[in-house]
Amino acid sequence: MDLARDPTGAEIAKFIATRTGAQMVQLMRCIKEPAAQAAFTAKLLVASPAVSGQPATPEKARKALNAFVGFRCYYITIPMFKPWPMKKLSNLIGLLWEADPNKSLWSLMAKAWSTIRDQIGKDQAPLNQFFRIICPHLKLPDPASYLEIHGWILNVNEEGDPTISRSADSEFASIGTGNTDMTLSVEDIITYVQSLGYAHGFILDDNKPSSTFLGHSVSSTLEKNTSAISATQATSKAAHARFLVRNKRRAKRQAVRNASYRASLDQDILIAHQLDPAPVDNHVPDCYSTTAPVLNQSPNQFYDGLTTLLSDQIPTIQDDAGHLDNAHLFNDCSLPGDVSFMNIDDFTTNMPNLIDYDAFRLGADEDVTLPIFDDITQI
């Protein structure tokens, strides 16, 4: 039979560390003496946290920053790019990256920032602040002067989109940019930015050898730059050719639409007038001929004489002024229509010969014998 023994301090500590909250409250209630409760509470305050028996899941490694992404984040702030959104500048940034002679520097800077971020977090290592510190140190062009230093010209096409092209004398514009005569490592970049107050929480492992370093040479930079320029110029020419082909297609479609509009308009005019379209080269008359018959306007002696006689016999106010007040005029409207002029008392006229005009009265006998006009020659 095993003898009872007192537990060791390690066993007590392990027992306490593996208790739940409810069990700890129960233990506190079992201690009656105040001194013992105070000692137990002090022990709990300095006790190490409980360690789970299951192994902790390792944190997934973060993806390192891409060199092009870093280049884009820095040079997207070029002042001349400000009027356009990012989607219109992506192609331009790609062209700048293809011709940039400092891709190796950007890869090294991206590696250095990724190392800092993985240890202290992204919030404690702002990317834009990192580039503002290290890029001037490495003699990289700032965004305001990048296009001019590398010989780029910014233009705007007919659709209002930005385009870039390179001047003919820009082949040697990139020589001398960047630190071409220095050996650089990731640790060198981290040490420099920390010396200026960036990423204080990062702890550099001095015992770990650098896995990434850079040694520049002017000749290699020039060769890369020349090939990049050739590729960029070829890309620009291809884009311009595509632009011209697209404009030709649009012009052709517009010409077809205009022709259809003209044909439709001509058809509408033809239907409206029911006439054949006049030739373009012939003179168009001011008015169109009609099919209405034209009256015979040749003079007729009988009708001309009759019109003259009737118009001359109508008295005027001036001619009738000398007649008596109680006399009736020939053209008096107050006279009844069924009374013969010959039966009217005090009838007066200014005609030299009294002629019976009852045959011309409305409703007269159509078979009445017409008067003889002595002054009209017989036809």
From Swiss-Prot:
<keyword id="KW-0278">Fertilization</keyword>
<dbReference type="GO" id="GO:0045895">
    <property type="term" value="P:positive regulation of mating-type specific transcription, DNA-templated"/>
</dbReference>
<comment type="function">
    <text>Mating type proteins are sequence specific DNA-binding proteins that act as master switches in fungal differentiation by controlling gene expression in a cell type-specific fashion. Transcriptional activator that induces the transcription of alpha-specific genes.</text>
</comment>
<dbReference type="GO" id="GO:0005634">
    <property type="term" value="C:nucleus"/>
</dbReference>
<keyword id="KW-0539">Nucleus</keyword>
<comment type="similarity">
    <text>Belongs to the MATALPHA1 family.</text>
</comment>
<dbReference type="GO" id="GO:0008301">
    <property type="term" value="F:DNA binding, bending"/>
</dbReference>
<keyword id="KW-0804">Transcription</keyword>
<dbReference type="InterPro" id="IPR006856">
    <property type="entry name" value="MATalpha_HMGbox"/>
</dbReference>
<keyword id="KW-0805">Transcription regulation</keyword>
<dbReference type="Pfam" id="PF04769">
    <property type="entry name" value="MATalpha_HMGbox"/>
</dbReference>
<protein>
    <recommendedName>
        <fullName>Mating-type protein MAT-1</fullName>
    </recommendedName>
</protein>
<dbReference type="GO" id="GO:0007338">
    <property type="term" value="P:single fertilization"/>
</dbReference>
<feature type="DNA-binding region" description="Alpha box">
    <location>
        <begin position="60"/>
        <end position="117"/>
    </location>
</feature>
<keyword id="KW-0238">DNA-binding</keyword>
